[in-house]
C-alpha cells in the first residue's frame, strides 16, 4: 500500500463522511481479502484436551480460519462489512459479498459454536475475541442482509457468556494488549446498544463505572514494548461512551489533569516501531492507530474551547500519520492493522 497519509488528510478521510475515502477503503478491503482466507501461518490459542483436538484450524474454525489467528479473522470480517456498508458500490464490493455468502452459512456457524461449547473453551478468546465478534455482529446488523442472522447463534452465545462473566470480574485488566477489559467493553457496548440488549448494556455501564469511576491523576506509564492499546486512553474512551457528557468532562479533567499541557507526554507522542517483522514490536503500529481512535473519540466529547480538544486532535493526526504507511510492511502487521486504521478513521461517537 502506498503511503497515502503522506499525501494529505484529504486523501485519507472523506469530507462528507466520518470515514476513509473510497480509495483508501478499497485498499483496506483488498488487503483484508488477501489474508482473510489465508490458512497459514496460523496461531492456535485453544486448550487441547486430547489427540482428537489436534486438527487443522479450518476444521475447528470453519469461518474464522485465516488472518493468522481467530480474532484477527473476526475483525477482518468486521472491516469488510463496514467498508461494504460505507461504500456498497465499490468495485470490490461483489467480492466482499461473495466471500460473505461463502463464509456465513448455518453449518459453518454451528462449527464455530461447537468450539465455544467445549468445556475447555470456556475462556477461549475472552475478552478480545468475544468483543470483536460482537462488534462484527453489530456491523452485520446495520448492513442488513442474511449474514447477521446466520451468525446470531454465535453472537448470542458470546453475549450470554459476557453477561455471565462481568458480574464476577471484580477487577479490570489494564494491559496494553488482548486482555484489556476497557477495549472489550467499548466494542461490546456497541453490540448491546445495536441489538437492544439492555441487560448487557446495563452490565457494561455498571462495570465500567465500578472499575474506573474513581480513577484520577493517571500516570500513563506506557507504552510497553508490545502494546497495541493505550490502557489510559481506551479507559477514557470507555468512560466517554458510558457517562453523560458533562459527567465525562468532569471525570476526564480529574483523570488526566495535565492534558491541556500535553502531559503525560507519552500519550501525545507516537511510539517508535523498530522492527515490523517482529510480531510483538509490530503491535506498536497498532498502538499508534488505536491512540488516534481514542483521541478522536475523546476530543468529540470536549468543549470546543477546551485546550485539550485541539491537543487531542493534533495527537490523533500525528499517530495516524505515523502508522498508516506501514499497514502492509510485513505480514505480522498486515493481517490485522487495517482494522485499527478503520477504527481510527470512522469510529467516533
Locations of the language-model features?
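Low-complexity, Ser/Thr/Pro/Gly-enriched N-terminal "stalk/linker" regions
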Residues: 5, 11-65
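Well-ordered alpha-helical scaffold segments within catalytic/enzyme domains
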Residues: 12-20, 77-90, 131-146, 184-196, ...
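Solvent-exposed loop and edge beta-strand segments that line ligand/cofactor-binding
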Residues: 17-21, 57-74, 114-130, 168-181, ...
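Extended ligand-binding groove/face enriched in aromatic
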Residues: 74, 83-192
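Carbohydrate-active enzyme catalytic cores, enriched for enzymes
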Residues: 103, 107-117, 230-235, 239-247, ...
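Active-site-proximal alpha-helical scaffolds that flank and shape metal-associated catalytic sites
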Residues: 124-131, 175-186, 190-193, 209-261
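Long, well-ordered core segments of solenoidal/helical folds
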Residues: 28-41, 53, 96-114, 153-170, ...
Amino acid at each position: 500500500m502506498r503511503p497515502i497519509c503522506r499525501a494529505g488528510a484529504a486523501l485519507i478521510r472523506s469530507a462528507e463522511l466520518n470515514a476513509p475515502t473510497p480509495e483508501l477503503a478499497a485498499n483496506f478491503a483488498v488487503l483484508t481479502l488477501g489474508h482473510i482466507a489465508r490458512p497459514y501461518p496460523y496461531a492456535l490459542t485453544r486448550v487441547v484436551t486430547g489427540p482428537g483436538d489436534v486438527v487443522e484450524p479450518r476444521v475447528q474454525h470453519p469461518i474464522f480460519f485465516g488472518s493468522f489467528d481467530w480474532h484477527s479473522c473476526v475483525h477482518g470480517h468486521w472491516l469488510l462489512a463496514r467498508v461494504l456498508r460505507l461504500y456498497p458500490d465499490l468495485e470490490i464490493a461483489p467480492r466482499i459479498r461473495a466471500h460473505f455468502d461463502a463464509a456465513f452459512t448455518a453449518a459453518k456457524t454451528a462449527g464455530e459454536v461447537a468450539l465455544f461449547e467445549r468445556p475447555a473453551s470456556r475462556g477461549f478468546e475472552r475478552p478480545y475475541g468475544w468483543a470483536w465478534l460482537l462488534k462484527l455482529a453489530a456491523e452485520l446488523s446495520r448492513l442488513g442482509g442474511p449474514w447477521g442472522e446466520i451468525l446470531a447463534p454465535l453472537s448470542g452465545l458470546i453475549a450470554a457468556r459476557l453477561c455471565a462473566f462481568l458480574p464476577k470480574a471484580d477487577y479490570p485488566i489494564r494491559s496494553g494488549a488482548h486482555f484489556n477489559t476497557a477495549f472489550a467493553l467499548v466494542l461490546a457496548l456497541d453490540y448491546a446498544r445495536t441489538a437492544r440488549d439492555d441487560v448487557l448494556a446495563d452490565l457494561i455501564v455498571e462495570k465500567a463505572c465500578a472499575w474506573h469511576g474513581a480513577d484520577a491523576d493517571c500516570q500513563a506509564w506506557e507504552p510497553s514494548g508490545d502494546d497495541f492499546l493505550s490502557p489510559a486512553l481506551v479507559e477514557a474512551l470507555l468512560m466517554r461512551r458510558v457517562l453523560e457528557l458533562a459527567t465525562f468532562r468532569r471525570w476526564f479533567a480529574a483523570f488526566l489533569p495535565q492534558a491541556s499541557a500535553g502531559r503525560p507526554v507519552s500519550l501525545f507522542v507516537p511510539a517508535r516501531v523498530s522492527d515490523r517483522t517482529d510480531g510483538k514490536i509490530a503491535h506498536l503500529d497498532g498502538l499508534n492507530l488505536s491512540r488516534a481512535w481514542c483521541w478522536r473519540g475523546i476530543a468529540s466529547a470536549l468543549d470546543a474551547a477546551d485546550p485539550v480538544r485541539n491537543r487531542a486532535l493534533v495527537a490523533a493526526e500525528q499517530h495516524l500519520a505515523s502508522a498508516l504507511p506501514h499497514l502492509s510492511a510485513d505480514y505480522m502487521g498486515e493481517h490485522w492493522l487495517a482494522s485499527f486504521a478503520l477504527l481510527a478513521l470512522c469510529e467516533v461517537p
